[in-house]
Amino acid sequence: MIDRKPFDKLGGADHGWLKAKHHFSFASYYDPNNMNWGALRVWNDDEIAPNTGFPPHPHSDMEIITYVRDGAITHQDNLGNKGRTVAGDVQVMSAGSGIRHAEYNLEPETTRIFQIWIEPKSFGGAPSWGSKPFPKGDRSGKFVTLASGFSDDADALPIRTDARVLGATLKAGETTTYALGKDRSGYLVPAAGVVEVNGVRLNARDGAGIKDEAVITITALEDAELVLVDAA
């Protein structure tokens, strides 16, 4: 089953400095029938104006993954962590028992991100943050695991949940597959490009909730950049 969510039907808000679209209920957008997809709780599509951002604010008991589509995001938190994550790379934050952080676009151009929240396997624990560059060529034509709660994904950033976050790029006409498993919940968003997922067309920034599909087959109708969450 593929549940398509067109980008222009997503909830959202325009704060001037921040233009946000919400794949699931978030902040002022609330739909009791659209709260989550399995353990995936939030997928926000954010555009952040130059030299603006999110001032210090708290989080707890959530795995928060930021995928940078364009520009860069600079993170700073009360643990002393600081880092700049650029387009195509990810940062992860395990909020655990509580963390306070800020995220700013310190670049001269608009930064575009996907911010993904996944419920953890257990509450509490020491908070942590990490970021890592991923060679862009490695994900050409196939999915590469960027963040994972599984120990055998040794090259991925660790998260404390039964989930993976994956990225891929496809040239027009290319096809790739991913063995999801019928007991898993997948959510796929093309950051760019038009694709078909098991025969369902997705435009750029549309969402596709995927359940009861052992394997997903993605064909690029034009050059595409993909982000996939495989969650419980």
UniProtKB/Swiss-Prot annotation:
InterPro entries reported for this sequence: Pirin, Pirin_N_dom, Quercetinase_C, RmlC-like_jellyroll, RmlC_Cupin_sf
Cited CDD domains: cupin_Yhhw_N
Range of residues in the leader sequence: none
Record-linked SUPFAM superfamilies: RmlC-like cupins (SSF51182)
Top-level taxon of origin: Bacteria
Family: Belongs to the pirin family.
Protein name, UniProt field: Pirin-like protein CC_1473
